[in-house]
Amino acid sequence: MEVAAKLSGARISAQKARLVADQIRGKKVGDALNLLAFSSKKAAEIMKKVLESAVANAEHNEGADVDDLKVSTVFVNEGRSLKRIMPRAKGRADRIVKRSCHITVKVADK
């Protein structure tokens, strides 16, 4: 049994979120939550919420035991980009790209 949780449009770049996703992939849920709780990255806080949602889905919908779950799949896809302008000297402007991503976490029995 595999249960998923997805967050669309998280306001962090996919590159930064993938650094955290690579750390928790394949770990037991308890170990992954512990690792995310003590990580200082912004993506860790977002990823922790998605993982907790996946665990709650498994517990509520499938009646799974939390101690037996592991993170089977984590992937991060690029979302929409917000394009903004930063005024510069002499009438010029720089483009600012505010990136977002879609985070999917799947948990499964061992």
UniProtKB/Swiss-Prot annotation:
Coiled-coil ranges per UniProt: none
Protein keywords: Ribonucleoprotein, Ribosomal protein, RNA-binding, rRNA-binding
Gene Ontology MF terms: rRNA binding; structural constituent of ribosome
Keyword Transmembrane listed: no
Its job: This protein binds specifically to 23S rRNA; its binding is stimulated by other ribosomal proteins, e.g. L4, L17, and L20. It is important during the early stages of 50S assembly. It makes multiple contacts with different domains of the 23S rRNA in the assembled 50S subunit and ribosome. The globular domain of the protein is located near the polypeptide exit tunnel on the outside of the subunit, while an extended beta-hairpin is found that lines the wall of the exit tunnel in the center of the 70S ribosome.
Assembly and oligomerization: Part of the 50S ribosomal subunit.
HAMAP family in UniProt: Ribosomal_uL22_B
Protein name: Large ribosomal subunit protein uL22
Organism annotation: Stutzerimonas stutzeri (strain A1501)
Taxonomic lineage of the native organism: Bacteria, Pseudomonadati, Pseudomonadota, Gammaproteobacteria, Pseudomonadales
Gene that produces this protein: rplV
